[in-house]
Each structure stands twice: as C-alpha cells, then as structure tokens.
C-alpha cells in the first residue's frame, strides 16, 4: 500500500537523521 511505502521512506529518513546526530549518542531509533 502507499502508506507502507511512505513509512519505509520515513524510517530511512529518521535513521539518516539519527546517524547525523551520533554525537549526541542518539542511538535508540536505530534499535527499534
């Protein structure tokens, strides 16, 4: 479905943003 595709893109975006904030030790989003 369209929503699932959007969710996957959003999750990828969140992971990319999270990686850019590794300095803050913000790794909980990757663990989900």
From Swiss-Prot:
Record GO terms (molecular function): metal ion binding; metallopeptidase activity; peptidase activator activity; toxin activity
Tissue specificity as recorded in UniProt:
Expressed by the venom gland.
Q: What compartments host this protein? A: Secreted
Q: What is its EC number?
A: 3.4.24.-
Q: Where is the Peptidase M12B domain?
A: 10-32
Named cofactor requirement(s): Zn(2+)
Enzyme class at the top of the EC tree: hydrolase
Record note on quaternary structure = Heterodimer of a metalloproteinase subunit and a regulatory subunit comprising two disulfide-linked lectins (14 kDa and 17 kDa chains) (AC Q9PRP7 and AC Q9PRP8).
The identity of this protein, by name, is: Zinc metalloproteinase carinactivase-1 catalytic subunit
